[in-house]
């Protein structure tokens, strides 16, 4: 049982996932710092509140802190955009095997078509 567990842990997918989770947590802290320390003060220059997270509206006795929600939306959009760019970059570096095979087939097809055209002459 320990041997099976060792094989499971040492498989590439599990290690890749663990590294991804650790890097993701560190990246989330970095994005939060970017939003809290750079983006929020810039927005604070244009609104009355110095911190975006403290923006709110009160209706009756209920207080709606929409600033905290906006803060989370900014964090999400930045994180999603950076992940999107990273995935596009990684996909360019490591094309899928299917894409490589398809490119080879296209080259073979072009070569065969050229040979056919030459034989027609």
Swiss-Prot record:
SUPFAM superfamilies: Gated mechanosensitive channel. One of its GO terms (cellular component) is plasma membrane. One of its GO terms (molecular function) is mechanosensitive monoatomic ion channel activity. The chain crosses the membrane at residues 14-34, 67-87. It comes from the Bacteria. It is a multi-pass membrane protein. PROSITE patterns: MSCL. It is found in: Cell membrane. InterPro entries: Mechanosensitive_channel_CS, MS_channel, MSC/AndL, MscL_channel. Keywords: Cell membrane, Ion channel, Ion transport, Membrane, Transmembrane, Transmembrane helix, Transport. Belongs to the MscL family. Homopentamer. Channel that opens in response to stretch forces in the membrane lipid bilayer. May participate in the regulation of osmotic pressure changes within the cell. This is Large-conductance mechanosensitive channel. It comes from Lactococcus lactis subsp. cremoris (strain MG1363).
